């Protein structure tokens, strides 16, 4: 049981701490995702009703 707890507590390569260089890239991806989602929502909304494209 102790061995299993030790193995579970060892950090893996997939889980790494974020550095200050990682933050702008994560922010960029979040902004890009929000922009694409907004554009796709406007296209669906505005196609039948052009007045909603403000």
UniProtKB/Swiss-Prot annotation:
Domain notes per entry: The cysteine framework is V (CC-CC).
Superkingdom assignment: Eukaryota
One Pfam family it belongs to: Chi-conotoxin
Family assignment from sequence similarity: Belongs to the conotoxin T superfamily.
InterPro entries documented for this protein: T-conotoxin (IPR031565)
Tissue specificity remark: Expressed by the venom duct.
Positions of the pro-segment in this chain: 15-43
UniProt modified residues of type 6'-bromotryptophan: 51
Signal peptide coordinates: 1-14
Protein name: Conotoxin vc5c
Keyword entries, A-Z: Bromination, Cleavage on pair of basic residues, Disulfide bond, Gamma-carboxyglutamic acid, Secreted, Signal, Toxin
Upper classification of the organism: Eukaryota, Metazoa, Spiralia, Lophotrochozoa, Mollusca
Subcellular location, principal: secreted
One annotated Gene Ontology cellular component of this protein: extracellular region
PTM per Swiss-Prot/TrEMBL: Contains 2 disulfide bonds that can be either 'C1-C3, C2-C4' or 'C1-C4, C2-C3', since these disulfide connectivities have been observed for conotoxins with cysteine framework V (for examples, see AC P0DQQ7 and AC P81755).
UniProt modified residues of type 4-carboxyglutamate: 50
Subcellular location(s) of the protein: Secreted
Gene Ontology MF annotations: toxin activity
